[in-house]
Structures are given as C-alpha cells and as structure tokens.
C-alpha cells in the first residue's frame, strides 16, 4: 500500500512539473519574452493542492515524452524570436495576466499533440456575458477547459500563514483565499453551465474537464516568519517583502550585488540585465530617496554578475510603504 501511494505521489508530482529537468533553462536564454515564455511553461505552480483540479496545460503534449524537444524549441526561438514578438504585438493591454495568457496561447498553438480549440471564449446569455473560458484544448487525454492565472502574494507579518486568506496581493485588492474560492465557485464551473454547453457543442466538444493552472511567487515577511499557505507546492517560487523602515537592516543581511526595481512587465522570469545595463549603487539610492513614502509596492531585484558580464537575478523583494497593508475600507 505504501509503495503504491508513493508511486501515485511521484506520478502526481511529475504531472504537475512534467519538465523539471529544464527548470534552469529560463536563466540560460537571452530574449526577455522567450525567457518569460520558458518561465511560464517550466516554473512550478504556486500550489500542489488548490482545493480544485489542477493540470499543467502541456500535460498531454508530445513534449512531455521528450522534454529536450521542448528545450530545443525554446532555444531555437531565443535565436529567432520574431514569431513570438509578432504574436505578443497583438496585445492591446499591459496587464500581466493577459500577457501570461498570451504566452500560453502561443505555446499551445505550437505544442505537438495539442489542439487549441478556443481562447478567451465569452459565454453569453443574450446580451449578458456570463463569463469567459480562458483556454479550451484537445489532447490525447481528452478535451479540457483551463483557467490560467499568474499571481504574486505577500504573506502575513504575524498570524497564520497557512490560511490562504492571509496572503495579500501587493495592492491589497486580492487575497489567495478569495482567488481560490472564485476559481472553484465560479470560473471553473462556467463550462458546465447550459449556455456553455451550446458554445462547446459548436466547437465539437461534448464533455470537458475544467482545471486550473496557477503560477507565480509567494513573498515571505522580513523580519519575521510566515508559514507557507496550506497546499503550497514544495518547489514554489519565493521572495521576501519588507517595509521601507527595514530596508537598511535588510541590506546588512544580503550578499553583495546590485539592486534595481523591476517594471511590471518584468515580473515573470528571473531578471537578466546585459553587461553595462545594471544600476549603480548611486542610481538606486537616488531612486529610493525620490520614491514617495506611500508609493505602491515596488518589486526589487538583486543582481549578481555572471561570467559573461551580464547580471542575473539572485533574489527578489517587495518593498512596501510603512503603512502597508492599506486594506480597502480599512
């Protein structure tokens, strides 16, 4: 019994991270969008147990049988990124979630053994929109409705970190617990509703499985300690968060490197800055002094110099105002 349980757990872990041997590839690529694409496909999910079904979008692709084939595709794209650049140029929004979805759509169009049937399919009742299905795909395991999400959450400075409701988005408008409840209670149920079945039938889909894929980072308080939220994936990506009043103390505990803020569109893959492009200590200090005391949370990255002279991300930190969190209505 124990051996079979272990085999099931190993099989589940493999299905959640089918390309674990490629986990370092994003850092080896050069083009920013290709690095983001590789990160989206290869990074671990936030949660191993989300309270609703999860599925890696490429689980039924031929790439799973030969991960090096996926690695070769990404490396080739890094040398000639025009197809990805053209695809992303169609985006009319700078929203991180839409960028993340677009990266996945590009990959699913290219993935061997996967047919992308629809993306962002609106479900309507007359003139009223009931919801939207992020991804509909067909592979060797059947037809699937997938909801995709990219999230960054900050853990509680004191209290029960195991409670997903205690994990806040940097703008305090979102909670991990609320997001999971919305996914389970609304987004993943849409494809089973009568109006959806009509739309699905038009695509030749009789039955569909609804599943989630949630990527992102969890940021732990400094100083202090928070336990990981219940169900967190053991390999989930992480950083720290701290108030501005603690910044100088934090620096004293850090290895050497160069700090600079990450623009929002750079929040996915580990940052890479070309030789000569990193901020000096003086540049960062000047930026920090000019930053408003109640500025929104800033995602900072510490860079270390590589052998080729480029600067690679070593850690990331959310720096928040001393008054954070400013909860709506608080």
Where are these regions (language model features)?
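N-terminal amphipathic/basic-hydrophobic helices that include classical n-h-c signal peptides
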Residues: 1-15
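Intrinsically disordered, low-complexity Ser/Thr/Pro/Gly-rich regulatory segments
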Residues: 11-330
